[in-house]
Amino acid sequence: MNQAHRAPMAFSPAALLALLLALVSHTHAAEPVPGPAKPFAERLAAADVVNGRVVFGRCRTCHYPDKGAGHQNGPSLWNVWGRQAGTQEGFAYYSQALKDSRLVWSPEILDAWLADPRGFIPGNMMMSLGVPDPQERADLIAYLMQFREQ
């Protein structure tokens, strides 16, 4: 058969639209529909500390949770619970916004902070955009809860 004389394949607009809709509906059918996040207490009770350590890998550029590790680009996270934000001794780079916030770190406050650091305290200097996944935040917080005085 001579390829030079083959007529181009033609599709009707309706056939193209049907094909496009089938592809789009198939693609979106596999994606879960996000619902409201479970309450923090439920997420924390189901937290995976091992995954929290993995999630903390994103934070390690600026923070260390280990006792005696000191500060990096961000303050040490050792024994952060119950401490007023912006008051870690030896860390000089807190934003005025964080110092003025007067918030005290708790697991619930950290969950809200990590959901949207820039929106939670506008003007703070944290480089990260946070941890958008609610369960990953709970996993991370459960991991960080290990790093405190007993």
Residue ranges of each PLM-predicted region?
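The canonical Cys-X-X-Cys-His
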Residues: 52, 56-65, 140, 144
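Electrostatic cytochrome c docking/interface patches
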Residues: 30-55
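Gly/Gly-Pro-rich "capping" loops immediately C-terminal to redox-active cysteine motifs
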Residues: 49-53, 64-106, 128-130
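Short, solvent-exposed loop/turn segments at the edges of secondary structure
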Residues: 12-13, 72, 121
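C-terminal capping alpha-helices of c-type cytochrome domains
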Residues: 104-150
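N-terminal secretory signal peptides that target proteins for export/translocation
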Residues: 1-10
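Signal peptide processing junction and immediate N-terminal pro/mature segment
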Residues: 23-31
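Bacterial N-terminal signal peptides
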Residues: 13-24
